[in-house]
Amino acid sequence: MLTITSYFGFLLTALTITSALFIGLSKIRLI
């Protein structure tokens, strides 16, 4: 159970970082 929770936590963190980087690149390109 702990491994599943940590796995989803890691996946959520990776998704958040990827989204932040993607939005950052989009803003830079728009400017």
Swiss-Prot record:
InterPro entries: Cyt_b6/f_cplx_su6
Keyword Electron transport: yes
Source taxon at top rank: Eukaryota
GO MF, any single term: electron transporter, transferring electrons within cytochrome b6/f complex of photosystem II activity
Coiled coil (residue ranges): none
Record carries keyword Transport: yes
Pfam families per the UniProt record, alphabetical: PetL
Membrane topology summary: Single-pass membrane protein
Keywords in alphabetical order: Chloroplast, Electron transport, Membrane, Photosynthesis, Plastid, Thylakoid, Transmembrane, Transmembrane helix, Transport
Localization annotation: Plastid, Chloroplast thylakoid membrane
Annotated function: Component of the cytochrome b6-f complex, which mediates electron transfer between photosystem II (PSII) and photosystem I (PSI), cyclic electron flow around PSI, and state transitions. PetL is important for photoautotrophic growth as well as for electron transfer efficiency and stability of the cytochrome b6-f complex.
Quaternary state and interactors: The 4 large subunits of the cytochrome b6-f complex are cytochrome b6, subunit IV (17 kDa polypeptide, PetD), cytochrome f and the Rieske protein, while the 4 small subunits are PetG, PetL, PetM and PetN. The complex functions as a dimer.
Protein name from the UniProt record: Cytochrome b6-f complex subunit 6
Organism listed in the record: Lactuca sativa
Gene that this polypeptide is encoded by: petL
